[in-house]
From Swiss-Prot:
Domain Helicase ATP-binding stretches: 82-246
Family: Belongs to the DEAD box helicase family. DEAH subfamily. DDX15/PRP43 sub-subfamily.
Binding site for ATP: 95-102
A biological process term (GO) from this entry: mRNA splicing, via spliceosome
Any Gene Ontology CC annotation: catalytic step 2 spliceosome
Record GO terms (molecular function): ATP binding; helicase activity; hydrolase activity; RNA binding; RNA helicase activity
Organism: Drosophila melanogaster
Classification via PROSITE patterns: HELICASE_ATP_BIND_1 (PS51192), HELICASE_CTER (PS51194)
Residue span of region Disordered: 1-25
The entry's keywords: ATP-binding, Helicase, Hydrolase, Immunity, Innate immunity, mRNA processing, mRNA splicing, Nucleotide-binding, RNA-binding
Catalytic activity: ATP + H2O = ADP + phosphate + H(+)
Name of the protein this chain belongs to: ATP-dependent RNA helicase DHX15 homolog
Gene designation: Dhx15
Domain Helicase C-terminal: 271-451
Length: 729
């Protein structure tokens, strides 16, 4: 490997205290300024004895955590921050990962909010894992119970109460709150953390909040970023003041591969083993991979390799980290490394993570970082209406963030599993904003619910392509969420209340008409959680046989329903899941999602009903309800043996994971998967007459491209027009 030494974060160090707006001439002067503004507030390095939030003495744990807090780089900037917060409505803050900005600054904002009244503080995170784990940590630092004064809110899970003062939440959840409270009146301060990630929800929130702060002079907005490229945020928010907080940084040695790696997963696992065996300094390893399956596979293989090497090698504890892990397993990343063994061989932990560990979470003790140079990214093609998660090269900014994780506590090493030439010449400088590569159906529905009708002139930081917006409007019009003038319909208003894609929301609401809303609730919940079928490499045949025991002849949606029913009949037994190769966590999560969706249905008086199981219409009604949401995601079997998607004319195949043992003429599909081939995944057999009768606007044959499907539908249309056939339907 070639190597080059760099100083991670050196840009901060030289500039941080020279910023005229953010730095103070002396701590005493700053404290005096803040004291004048906030009526006596002076930063205190001595821990107080009484907790004003609970009126009880602080615990010993609080005292211990306080000593760690005052050692964080951000702590000496407390007076500067409080001064800026008092003088300005919007602040842009750049703080490197590990500076303490995510845990400390929201707590200072609580002090500010309490001094002004009793309104709360919201701090958004792009990822649910970060929202949960940071809320847990901050509740400990504030010596309060999680879910009371400090809480979190993520999709399908709200751990907060009316008295919560500080709420960590995903950016999407704050956007959802704005739909019912457009002025966000319950908040005194809103912090947008990790704004540099430019997620879809964060970009929309910035546009919404820019307008809200114009109308609410008392609301404070803090935009926090971990990268130096803050000028764009300042400019967007009318030249808001910039505050820079340096992180603790140590030199990081960067190693590149001389040649591109053919199999980055194999190379990454090999590098972990080499580091553990050959590096003579203590320190943990952080390895970046792209998703849950890859991470679980890597953990198994690393464990197997280490076990095969025998007891002479120090213990290596492998800990996975991805967004759908339950909170108790997420906390394992903070466990200490194993001690050295009897012969002195070093014990380490290796955290195998998605890009959540780039900036959202800080793991102390990491000295070695392995960066294969890939992450999963959403991509969208509006012409064929296909959105997919693809494994894509990361940006230079992400690569720098990753390497910086190695220099947090001492000098470290970063092993980049790509060439230096690829880093310099092939990687983009920054990650492309998600709004420019996403299906905007959900976003447009939310903006319409917020009362923002003129989408063309909405103040996007980076405006999406007009074609993408038009596709979203077209989708919502066909789903009857918008009328022909683009106005929100009553149905659209109800759809917007469900934390679901518009198609799923429409399907769920329409299921009431087909007397199967209980079953569609279960299917929707199963589609909203990670894949429930487990297929380990060492037991693929047994896993496939187990899956076929749940298979339904009409397709995968009904197979998912069978799995959910069987899980409930087993009394939610984890052992039953293990024996049947079912992911227990996915099913528990689906059960929770189902309960949340049922509550929303009850709120809108949407009846929860079922067709009699013995009726011949039981499964027919469910399939008709599926069509009501997914009539735009239909494929027709051609004479070639391939499927052709309706209207978009994409050649596709059924995904190998399907339970269908035959090829129906017409199928609806849940997702389009782009790999080396085009696949449609989670498919169900449907009747073409349902398409024509349940979605006549979309299946208007006058606006149909010439294809085999059109000819079939024309013949069907003629039959439908005869009285006898209509009666039969």
């Amino acid at each position: 490997m070639s190597k080059r030494r760099i100083e991670v974060g050196e840009t901060y160090g030289s500039k941080a205290k020279k910023d005229p707006e953010a730095s103070s001439s002396s701590a005493a002067a700053a404290a005096g300024t803040v004291a004048q503004i906030l009526g006596g507030f002076v930063p205190n390095k001595q821990p107080p004895t009484m907790n004003p939030l609970t009126n009880t003495p602080y615990s010993q744990r609080y005292q211990n955590l306080y000593k760690k807090r005052i050692a964080l780089p951000v702590f000496e900037y407390q007076a500067d921050f409080m001064r800026l917060l008092s003088l300005h409505q919007c602040i842009v803050l750049v703080g490197e990962t590990g500076s303490g900005k995510t845990t400390q600054i929201p707590q200072w904002c609580v002090d500010f909010a309490v001094s002004k009244g009793r309104k709360g503080v919201s701090c958004t995170q792009p990822r649910r894992v970060a929202a949960m784990s940071v809320a847990q940590r901050v509740s400990e630092e504030m010596d309060v119970k999680l879910g009371e004064e400090v809480g979190y809110s993520i999709r399908f899970e709200d751990c907060s109460t009316a008295k919560t003062l500080l709420k960590y939440m995903t950016d999407g959840m704050l956007l959802r709150e704005a739909m019912s409270d457009p002025m966000l009146d319950q908040y005194q301060v809103i912090l947008l953390d990790e704004a540099h990630e430019r997620t879809l929800a964060t970009d929309i929130l910035m546009g919404v909040l820019k307008e809200v702060i114009r109308q609410r002079s008392d609301l404070k907005l803090v935009v926090m970023s971990a990268t130096l490229d803050a000028g764009k945020f300042q400019q967007y928010f009318d030249n808001a003041p910039l505050m820079k907080v340096p992180g603790r940084t140590h030199p990081v040695e960067i190693f590149y591969t001389p040649e591109p790696e053919r199999d980055y997963l194999e190379a990454a696992i090999r590098t972990v083993i080499q580091i553990h065996m050959c590096e003579e300094i203590e320190g943990d390893i952080l390895m970046f991979l792209t998703g849950q399956e890859e991470i679980e596979e890597a953990c198994k293989r690393i464990k197997r390799e280490i076990d095969n090497l025998g007891s002479e090698i120090g213990e290596l504890k492998c800990i996975p980290l991805y967004s759908t892990l339950p909170p108790n397993l997420q906390q394992r990343i903070f466990e200490p490394a194993p001690p050295p063994n009897a012969n002195g061989a070093i014990g380490r932990k290796v955290v195998v993570s998605t890009n959540i560990a780039e900036t959202s979470l800080t793991i102390d003790g990491v000295v070695f970082v392995i960066d294969p140079g890939f992450a999963k990214q959403k991509v969208y093609n509006p012409r064929i209406r296909v959105e997919s998660l693809l494994v894509s090269p990361i940006s230079k900014a992400s690569a720098q963030q990753r390497s910086g994780r190695a220099g947090r506590t001492r000098p470290g090493k970063c092993f980049r599993l790509y060439t230096e030439k690829a880093f310099k010449n092939e990687m983009q400088d920054n990650t492309y904003p998600e709004i420019l590569r996403s299906n905007l159906g959900t976003v447009v529905l939310q903006l319409k619910k917020l009362g923002i009708d003129d989408l063309v002139h909405f103040d996007f930081m980076d405006p999406p392509a007009p074609e993408t917006l038009m596709r979203a409007l077209e989708l919502l019009n066909y789903l009857a969420a918008l009328d022909d003038d683009g106005n929100l319909t009553d149905l659209g208003a109800v759809m917007s209340e469900f934390p679901l894609d518009p198609q799923l929301a429409k399907m769920l609401i329409a299921s009431c008409q087909h007397n199967c809303s209980n079953e569609i609730l279960s299917i929707t919940a199963m589609l909203s959680v990670p894949q429930c079928f487990v297929r380990p490499n060492e037991a693929k045949k047994a896993a496939d046989e187990a899956k076929m025991r749940f298979a339904h002849i009409d397709g995968d949606h009904l197979t998912l329903l069978n799995v959910y029913h069987a899980f409930k009949q087993s009394s939610e037994d984890p052992n039953w899941c293990y024996e049947n190769f079912i992911n227990f966590r996915s099913l528990k999560s689906a059960d929770n999602v189902r309960q949340q969706l049922a509550r929303i249905m009850d709120r809108f008086n949407l009846r929860r009903t079922s067709t009699e199981f013995t009726s011949k219409d039981y499964y027919v009604n469910i399939r008709k309800a599926l069509v009501q949401g997914f009539f735009m995601q239909v494929a027709h079997l051609e004479r070639t043996g391939y499927y052709l998607t309706i209207k978009d004319n994409q050649n596709v195949q059924l995904h190998p994971s399907t339970c269908l043992d035959h090829k129906p003429d017409w199928v609806i599909y849940n997702e389009f998967v782009l790999t080396t081939k085009n696949y449609i995944r989670t498919v169900t057999d449907v009747k073409p007459e349902w398409l024509c009768c349940l979605a006549p606007q979309y299946y208007d044959l006058n606006n149909f491209p010439q294809c085999e499907a059109k000819r079939q539908l024309e013949l069907l249309q003629q039959r439908l027009e005869t009285k006898q056939y209509q009666k039969g339907f």
